[in-house]
């Protein structure tokens, strides 16, 4: 199916099959479509609402074309990632949580990018922390094997995305591509926490990941609108485990934590996010640093559970709490900076 035929179908509010979507996505990602066609396709899909079959087709093509990171084993390797677009401008919770996971001995293959609508994307934060981002897939694998954590800079692994960059930027709206990033981890992880910008996406994206072979995934959205677990409100979870999907709400109190406002956790820049994370991961914390630490513990705990590194969400949160307060997570961030600095010298020689 070509993109013109697909547009005719979409205008008629008809869904594409998985295979038809694969054909259209391959044309988009290999530069066979004009920017006008891509923009029309993305808007048409949004107006119609993307089906599970369509998302599966799009994800499978992006995964196929990605520059992959080959790991010795994917057992218990986890990614904690959000779609962004929640408008809250909270500090980089998922990225900070990743260092707690690594300090707990749980390997992390973190996939992320620069901010699109927010103040600080994961790549922006890590760059502010002095971590070199432009790694080869082999270098990322060496980071994960040696340190238990590596960062995959999305634009380095999904170069085919460049064909859709112009239309996405000019539309300035959330499109299908906002959902695809968290579903296209270049290391092919089977364990994830995926935060989404709307509760209505939780179940569908859990079903997409089920069809694509994921093992244990939590797809989450909090009642106060975050694409992660919140301290200030219940969080809705669609959990894929043992090839079954269950849906439920989680309150901070269910996990042994106290509900509190998120006041003081919004940031205006990657540097401000880094300062708050340094405060949160350090041994002596300000009031905002303590609150940020609890937000990190909540989300790192969920990822420890998704990685099967803890038997329950509550056990994951307890482990994350213990690890964060050792100060080892901040040391892990500094180790990654030193480790990638060597690769920077190699790559720029």
From Swiss-Prot:
Keyword Membrane: no
Keyword Metal-binding part of the UniProt annotation: yes
Gene Ontology BP terms: L-tryptophan biosynthetic process
Listed Pfam families: Glycos_trans_3N, Glycos_transf_3
GO CC annotations, alphabetized: cytosol
GO molecular function list: anthranilate phosphoribosyltransferase activity; magnesium ion binding
Binding residues for anthranilate 1: 82, 113
Residues the entry annotates as binding Mg(2+) 2: 227-228
Residues at which anthranilate 2 binds: 168
HAMAP family associated with the record: TrpD
Function (record text): Catalyzes the transfer of the phosphoribosyl group of 5-phosphorylribose-1-pyrophosphate (PRPP) to anthranilate to yield N-(5'-phosphoribosyl)-anthranilate (PRA).
NCBIfam families per record: trpD
Name of this protein: Anthranilate phosphoribosyltransferase
Species name: Pseudomonas putida (strain ATCC 47054 / DSM 6125 / CFBP 8728 / NCIMB 11950 / KT2440)
The encoding gene: trpD
């Amino acid at each position: 199916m070509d993109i013109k035929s697909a547009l005719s179908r979409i205008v008629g509010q008809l869904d594409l099959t998985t295979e038809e979507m694969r054909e259209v996505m391959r044309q988009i990602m290999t530069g066979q479509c004009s920017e006008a066609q891509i923009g029309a396709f993305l808007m048409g899909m949004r107006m119609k609402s993307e089906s599970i079959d369509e998302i599966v087709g799009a994800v499978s093509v992006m995964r196929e074309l990605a520059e992959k990171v080959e790991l010795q084993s994917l057992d218990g390797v986890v990614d904690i990632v959000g779609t962004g677009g929640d408008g809250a401008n909270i500090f980089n919770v998922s990225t900070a949580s990743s260092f707690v996971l690594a300090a707990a001995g749980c390997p992390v293959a973190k996939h992320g990018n620069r901010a699109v609508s927010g103040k600080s994307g994961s790549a922006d934060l890590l760059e502010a922390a002095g971590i070199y981002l432009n790694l080869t897939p082999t270098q990322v694998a060496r980071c994960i094997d040696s340190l238990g954590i590596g960062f995959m800079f999305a634009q380095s692994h999904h170069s085919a995305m460049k064909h859709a960059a112009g239309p996405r930027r000019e539309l300035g709206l959330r499109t299908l591509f906002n959902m695809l990033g968290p579903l296209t981890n270049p290391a092919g992880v089977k364990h994830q926490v995926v935060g989404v910008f709307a509760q209505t996406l939780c179940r569908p994206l859990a079903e997409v990941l089920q069809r694509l072979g994921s093992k244990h995934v939590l797809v989450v959205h909090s009642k106060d609108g975050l694409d992660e677990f919140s301290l200030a409100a219940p969080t809705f979870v669609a959990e894929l485990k043992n090839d079954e999907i269950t849906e439920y709400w989680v309150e901070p109190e269910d996990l042994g934590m106290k509900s509190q406002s998120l006041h003081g956790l919004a940031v205006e820049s990657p540097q401000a996010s880094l300062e708050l994370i340094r405060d949160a991961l350090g041994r002596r914390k300000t009031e905002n640093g303590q609150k940020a630490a609890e937000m990190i513990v909540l989300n790192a705990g969920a990822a420890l559970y998704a990685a099967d590194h803890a038997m329950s969400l509550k056990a994951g949160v307890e482990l994350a709490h213990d690890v964060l307060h050792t100060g080892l997570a901040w040391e892990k961030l500094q180790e990654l900076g030193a480790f990638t600095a060597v690769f920077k010298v190699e790559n720029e020689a």
